[in-house]
A protein has these predicted regions:
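Noncatalytic alpha-helical scaffold of FAD-dependent oxidoreductases
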Residues: 1-174
Length: 174
């Protein structure tokens, strides 16, 4: 989204948006700063920003909330709303990225609700290419995403319902 202000100057490979609510008297900024410091020391993060006010907090959330619209404008080859057990989210991403890395020129957009294991894992044409060039591979792409999700004990269906009944039958023995 061209008019959307990004929180980081240099765009990182991954963003994690954390919104906390704490008991009265506790300082959320201090809690997040402690979290960032520990994560940085452990090599888990390279940068972090704590919202300084509600306007900045809303600005951070706007980046996340505009992702579906940005995806729609670009035009995905194949979009997925899947779930995997929370502890296996990194494994799903590793396996799926490795699988689709063999396909050549594609872009992947993965975002979701990491607190509950729901992911939107979307495949897009490479920059400057048309999604029509990939239409013959759409079923193969969908099958791979669903297979990886199910292999990890997840589902082809997350927050937006059960999806197509045929998939429910295929993976649940309908």
């Amino acid at each position: 989204m061209p008019d959307l202000r990004q929180p980081f100057e240099a765009r990182p490979e991954w963003f994690v948006l954390i919104d906390v609510g704490l008991a009265r008297g506790l300082d959320p900024a201090q809690a997040l700063e402690t979290l960032f410091a520990e994560a940085f020391e452990a090599g888990l993060v390279s940068d972090g920003i704590v919202a300084q006010n509600d306007a900045q907090r809303h600005q951070f959330w706007e980046v996340r909330e505009q992702m579906p619209e940005a995806n729609r404008r670009i035009g995905s080859v194949s979009s997925h709303d899947i779930s995997v057990p929370l502890g296996l989210v990194p494994e799903f991403i590793r396996r799926a990225d490795a699988h689709f890395g063999t396909m050549g020129d594609i872009r992947i957009n993965c975002f979701g609700h990491l607190g509950d294991g729901n992911l939107h894992y979307n495949i897009f044409p490479a920059q400057g290419r048309s999604k029509a060039e990939y239409v013959t591979r759409r079923d193969e792409i969908k099958r791979a995403v669903h297979d990886i999700s199910h292999d990890l004990g997840g589902s082809h269906s997350a927050e937006h319902g059960i999806g197509r009944f045929s998939l429910f039958e295929q993976y649940q023995g309908g």
